[in-house]
């Protein structure tokens, strides 16, 4: 019986199949590689996309975080050095058996330093989010920005970013009176204030209103994103600073230096991660409510040809 006809250059049936590569999404016209396609995103898309921002531009992202975050972390470590040095296992046991538990022995830092740390960390996050918004928005528009350009934009918009942060946290404080959970409402409404300040070039008050307008129609989804980011941030933070906490508990010398270094190292990862989610969430909301993906595609399609 004659063999079945086989088309020229065809693959034999028993030939092994080669795996199909799945490249990362790239912007049209050979632009920068994107962390996630510009489309409606799920919470896993936002979390994974934020990590991909760090992978795609580690020098720029970590450089921005280092310039903004490292001085703050070292300052806070030095400010709290005595309380950190006193927070060790031996002191805790001595006070427990003597009945004289002190604030220093139990690692209490006092209300003042703690409040200052919260404010400075919040301002750092706002400024880093502004810088990342400029970087990532540029990618989706087909433009690559240098580390120097990102840092300049972040600090140029630092004043409105700081004022917007204060406005948001005043609202959170008002909502939290008598009910801690109430702070989640403004935290959700104003989750994309920093990206709005930089991407749209608007002032703090307009950015607060703009964020509220974008998030209000998807309150549940944005709240879920906020809670997911908080959970991941807490888990990663504990993992990254765990060794430093053990070092402090053992009462070894130079505990405040180790604590400051661990906090600074954790900030280089966690701050860009949280900021990156805020940036991608801002883009997601604009895609859903305003068709940002269609607008950018039309701009590229009908852009005038270069002379």
PLM segments and residue spans:
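Hydrophobic alpha-helical membrane segments
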Residues: 1-307
